[in-house]
């Protein structure tokens, strides 16, 4: 039995809690929040909700702390700070900034002699492993990744941090013609813009500057600036009615060549279709938390 702490209790934190309940060898020690703990209700009976200020009291009671924050601003600060004191895992998904995040977390974990695993979800995460396997088998070829159609938690969180935004959902949508060309083994050369579009549904605060919000979204580096992005302003009622679910998915495809003249084409594909992005991501995090615990026990 290994003991898990959840740091942050939004959609992902709830997904981790649900995953812990389905794994017989895991125990939830506590949920830690920056909010007033009295306002946070969890599903696991007999488990406490604590303010993050109380976390240090649990240093010897938690085997792995699963950090459930946003990649835009939370995880770059949280994960290094917490890795000094706990074995930690996060799902940081800003691909362009992973090397920087790795260096910061690695330095912090070494200070506390802890193990830290970053960017562990399905992309980055399971999709990263799929690319590795496919490249090993087909060294001559081309990789393609398509996401969606589905809600990106990280991109939605990034929008919600813009001044004047009350709530937001961001859908990543693959360009159908591009997916078809890849699956047909045509090996197209595709720009970022040619592979996906982004659809944003935003609930603005009263009297917010809508033009400012739209511009901030469309020009946001690492998130939207390289894509054709549509921004739709809707009411809170429409958000609750039409965008409450959090589905997602996607495919990693490698089109490779074999033969002395590279005359044969092979298409390998690993795909996911998810009813709940946070619940699946939470399940991945719990699985890898188990590995962290085993590595730590072995002195790795």
Where are the regions a protein language model picked out?
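C-terminal substrate-binding/catalytic lobe of Rossmann-fold NAD(P)-dependent oxidoreductases
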Residues: 3, 14-15, 22-28, 32-55, ...
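Glycine-rich Rossmann-fold phosphate-binding loop(s) that bind the pyrophosphate
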Residues: 9
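Rossmann-fold NAD(P) dinucleotide-binding segment
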Residues: 55-64, 72-91
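General beta-strand structural signal in soluble alpha/beta enzymes
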Residues: 90-91, 116-120, 146, 169-170
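Rossmann-fold NAD(P)-binding glycine/threonine-rich loop
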Residues: 92-116
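Short alpha-helices
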Residues: 110-135, 285
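Oxidoreductase and adenylate-handling cofactor-binding alpha/beta cores
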Residues: 126-142, 157-167, 291
